[in-house]
């Protein structure tokens, strides 16, 4: 009995202790698997396979991306105030029909990058409860057009729908038949080759993205309410709007870049297009072909609607007056096309044009006059053409007051009117690189062919003259300018004198004189210089004047430097942010500068992995892998001698041992005879 009594007492105490432990545990705050910020639960990337059931009842937003959810059951029913649920990048294949039955307020649903093609019909049943849904993202789910049609069949409240990276091929009027409120639709990166009538009933659609598909043409376009159309990266050869519509098209941005356009698009007669992107096509103008007398020459093309046999269109191929209204265009990008001329007055049809990009075409001449360019032009890029001539008149250039950026690089320009740029009062940036340009001497520039006058251009800040075959820069060349960037690299015969940059000491911030044969130049006056390129100049040592500058970027590539003085390295390491040094002949035994740069975390050696050095045997090694062994006897001289002695003794003993073994093995009688001859002596007894 005493034993039983003691046992009962012990058990009672244990029960009391257990209750205390449980009570204390319940007093601690519960640990959530998500991070909570007000009414937002951040549960992304937590390796979760179910929706947490311990979140606050009033949670409005749940981010559940990058988890392991495969089947969405009733986990959201605990959160009736939910307005946004993001479940992208999971493994979701099915959604229970009752998954959203309590989510009456849900407006934004993101299910991108899952596997919903497995159970799309069940998912569609679940969507029936989402009567307030405004935004839906089903991108990257392997959906066909039929699956999409089922999924969105009852989502009449949708305003934004994202279906990129799926497997849709053909869209028609039934695909989105119930989406009358849709304002934005993204179907990029599918396999679409036909979209006939798919969007005609969407009277509120404003943004349509068709990029990265296989569309062959867009004909009889009449979506007047659309603001932005992106049809880039397709196979479009024709873009033709319905010319019979009198209603004004609201389209502001049209992107047809990276297609197969042969002709300038046939735009609406009444439109508000501001941005027109046509780069990387095959656009050209063909007025010269209109008068061809060949019997087989076609002058018109007919388009037929094979589906309904109505709305047939006939267009004159060579009529250059069918471009529609261009009066509102502000940005025109025709880069990388086949344009070799512009029809008379074509660019002047755009009186609001600010940006004109004509890079990589076939233009041979260009007119820099207000008769051919709108006075609003702000940036003009005619680089990488075949220009041999720039037309200008002294009276008209003064009217291009808004022109600020001009790029004429990589052409075949040789002859310039000397004062061609001085009358552009607001020209800020000019690039003439990769042409044949000379700098005029103020005293006789009028007699030179191809030279350009730069002095007194107060607005000019950035001037690029790389690879222009310049040989001399006179002392008065940049007088009256306030250049901050001057690029003269790749003029190997340039004779740059100290007075050549006279007047730029207080303004110059970037100077490029790589591959100019530079030898002696005093950089100390240019106290505001931040970036300097002196690469490919065969420099054997750094100019001392560099140490007076507060440089942030220095390019020393492809010179003849063998080392950098310790004091120079210390100064540069404190000031520089980025340095390029590859292509020099650094000595592997004089790399103190390398260690100095490595110890200073503020400097970034951009090409560190490529820098090499030469050892005593002229073998090349990566600087980052260099060992002192390449320098011969240095501080470890005594230790190296000991190793050589030990090696010699070891070899000698080995040879002697081998000799003895040979004698004992092959001539055993010779050894006793030799020993007897050498060692035996007559005794006295």
UniProtKB/Swiss-Prot annotation:
Q: Which residues lie on this side of the membrane: Cytoplasmic?
A: 662-685
Q: Where in the cell is it found?
A: Cell membrane; Endoplasmic reticulum membrane
- Sites carrying a glycan are 154, 230, 244, 291, 296, 309, 312, 325, 402, 407, 533
Q: Name one GO biological process term.
A: inflammatory response
Domain named LRRNT: which ranges? 29-56
What does the UniProt keyword field contain? Cell membrane, Disulfide bond, Endoplasmic reticulum, Glycoprotein, Growth factor binding, Leucine-rich repeat, Membrane, Repeat, Signal, Transmembrane, Transmembrane helix
SUPFAM superfamilies for the chain: L domain-like (SSF52058)
Q: Which residues belong to the signal peptide in this entry?
A: 1-27
Mind telling me which SMART domains this protein's record contains? LRR_BAC (SM00364), LRR_TYP (SM00369)
The topology of this chain with respect to the membrane is:
Single-pass type I membrane protein
Q: What GO CC annotations are associated with the protein?
A: cell surface; endoplasmic reticulum; endoplasmic reticulum membrane; extracellular matrix; extracellular space; plasma membrane
The residue spans the entry assigns to the Extracellular side of the membrane are as follows: 28-640
Q: Which PANTHER family match?
A: LEUCINE-RICH REPEAT AND IMMUNOGLOBULIN-LIKE DOMAIN-CONTAINING NOGO RECEPTOR-INTERACTING PROTEIN 2, SLIT RELATED LEUCINE-RICH REPEAT NEURONAL PROTEIN
Family label: Belongs to the LRRC32/LRRC33 family.
**UniProt name for this protein:** Transforming growth factor beta activator LRRC33
Phylogenetic classification of the source organism: Eukaryota, Metazoa, Chordata, Craniata, Vertebrata
